Regions:
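Short, conserved SAM-binding segment of the class I
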Residues: 110-115
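Helix-to-beta-strand junctions that scaffold the AdoMet/dcAdoMet cofactor pocket
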Residues: 105-106, 119-121
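Conserved catalytic/acceptor-binding region of the Class I
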Residues: 109, 124-195
Length: 259
């Protein structure tokens, strides 16, 4: 899995909006697992809520960011969190869960056979990934990243795409799973101060989608110039309204139960 520098505090700035898809995914899981592994657990804020649904389960969170694991261990000492690469992790578990993480793993669908093989019969693989890579927040970022001014600095700062729900369904059905796949577009209404270019949408992107670009621009002046240019583009694509800035965000959900 590609190494990216993460800032747990920045990520958690929109925790209420970011956590909603996780709860929508978990609420549809039909099984009662004894062991749960959360791949790409981040700061552990949503991993910890799994005890509400399954209070007797043994829960483990895995992430490749030392900063995220440190924050998770600090905030949720009752849950086991471990540093690891989710692309190579082989958990012994009844429920393999991943929330908004697999998009960072190139060719992640090619890993499905070994993950399903590791599950017991009746075990569940459930995940959610963003499906908004064709939205302005991402297409504008890609265009700017590939522009003459920035292409030389940001080569390789892209990230993997995701499949469509029907493609995930086919892949997992071929592995003898019963599959529930769907998509939802959330209309996040972002509110609060937004006196810098890009405002609240830029603040959201700073927690996730911008991380590879920020890693590729260690010079503070270059980074500030890039963010200012990107922020101006976001302001035009996501204008503020009297009730806040509306950020449409498509998500893809899959629950596969091994037969």
């Amino acid at each position: 899995m590609t190494s990216t520098t993460w800032d747990p505090s920045q990520y958690l700035r929109h925790a209420d909006h970011r956590s909603r898809p996780f709860h929508d995914l978990v609420n549809r899981i039909p099984t009662t697992p004894r062991r749960i592994t959360d791949l790409g657990c981040g700061p552990g804020n949503v991993t910890a809520t799994l005890t509400d649904r399954w209070p007797d389960a043994v829960i483990t969170g895995v992430d490749n960011s030392a900063a995220m694991i440190e924050r998770a261990q600090q905030d949720h000492p009752g849950i086991r969190f471990t540093l690891g690469d989710i692309a190579t992790h082989r958990p012994d578990t009844d429920l393999l869960l991943s929330n908004a993480a697999l998009q960072w793993v190139p060719d992640h669908a090619d890993l499905f056979p070994q993950w399903i093989d590791a599950l017991p019969v009746g075990g569940t693989f459930a995940f959610q990934v963003p499906g908004n890579f064709r939205s302005p927040s991402h297409t504008l970022l890609a265009d700017l990243r590939n522009s003459p001014r920035w292409a030389g600095h940001l080569a390789g700062a892209e990230r993997a795409d995701v499949l469509e729900p029907a493609e995930y369904l086919d892949r997992l059905a071929d592995l003898h799973c019963t599959v529930d796949a769907w998509e939802t577009t959330y209309l996040h209404v972002l509110t609060g101060p937004h006196d810098t270019p890009g405002g609240l949408v830029l603040d959201w992107m700073l927690g996730t989608g911008l991380r590879p670009a920020l890693d590729a621009l260690p010079d503070p002046e270059q980074r500030a110039a890039f963010l200012a240019e990107y922020g101006e583009l976001l302001d035009r694509a996501y204008p503020a309204t009297p009730h806040g800035t509306v950020l449409p965000f498509r998500r893809i959900f899959v629950i596969a139960v091994k037969q």
